[in-house]
Amino acid sequence: MTFVSDLFAIALGGSIGAVLRYLITLTVVSAPLSGWLTLHGSVGTTLANLLGCCALGGLFQFSQALVASDWVATGWAASLAHPRTLLAVRIGVLGSLTTFSTLIGETAVFASQGRILASSMLLGINVIAGWCLFWAAAAVVRNWTS
C-alpha cells in the first residue's frame, strides 16, 4: 500500500505543478507587455523553471536540516517533513512545474530560426540563474533552520 500511496502523492503533486506552470505561462502571455516580449512563451517557461529551482533549493536545505537531526520541524514544517509529502512536492509539483524538455525545445526553435543569441541567452539564463536561485534559497533556509 505504501508504494501506491507514494504514486498517488506524486500524481497529485504533479497535477498541481502542471496547473501552476500553465497559469504562469498564461499570465506572462496575457501581460500588458506580452507584445514587447518577443520570447513571451519562453519567459513563462523560464519563470516556471527559476521558481522551481528556488523552491527546490529551499526544499533541499530543509531536507538536509532534517537529516542533520539538530533541528526539529514543528507546525507546517513538520507536515512538509513527511517523506510522502516530500515526494509529492519534489517529484510531483516541482517535477511538473519545471520542464527541461520544453526549455530545450524552445531553444532549438530559436536556433533553427537563426536566433542563436536568443537561444543561447535563454539556455544560459535558465541554467545560471536557476543554479544561483537554488543555492540562494538553500542559504535562506539554512539560516532559518540553524
From Swiss-Prot:
UniProt keyword Methyltransferase present: no
Q: Where, subcellularly, is it found?
A: Cell inner membrane
State a single Gene Ontology molecular function: fluoride channel activity
GO BP terms: cellular detoxification of fluoride; fluoride transmembrane transport
Positions binding Na(+) in this chain are: G95, T98
* Residues that span the membrane, as ranges: 8-28, 47-67, 91-111, 121-141
Keywords in alphabetical order: Cell inner membrane, Cell membrane, Ion channel, Ion transport, Membrane, Metal-binding, Sodium, Transmembrane, Transmembrane helix, Transport
Broad class of where this protein is predominantly found: membrane
Pfam families according to UniProt: CRCB (PF02537)
Q: How does it sit in the membrane?
A: Multi-pass membrane protein
Relay the activity regulation note.
Na(+) is not transported, but it plays an essential structural role and its presence is essential for fluoride channel function.
Instruction: Give the CC-aspect GO terms.
Output: plasma membrane
Q: Which reaction does it catalyse?
A: fluoride(in) = fluoride(out)
Q: Which family does it belong to?
A: Belongs to the fluoride channel Fluc/FEX (TC 1.A.43) family.
Q: What does this protein do?
A: Fluoride-specific ion channel. Important for reducing fluoride concentration in the cell, thus reducing its toxicity.
- Record's PANTHER family? FLUORIDE EXPORT PROTEIN 1-RELATED, FLUORIDE-SPECIFIC ION CHANNEL FLUC
Q: What is the protein named?
A: Fluoride-specific ion channel FluC
- Tell me what organism the protein belongs to: Rhodopirellula baltica (strain DSM 10527 / NCIMB 13988 / SH1)
Gene behind this chain?
fluC
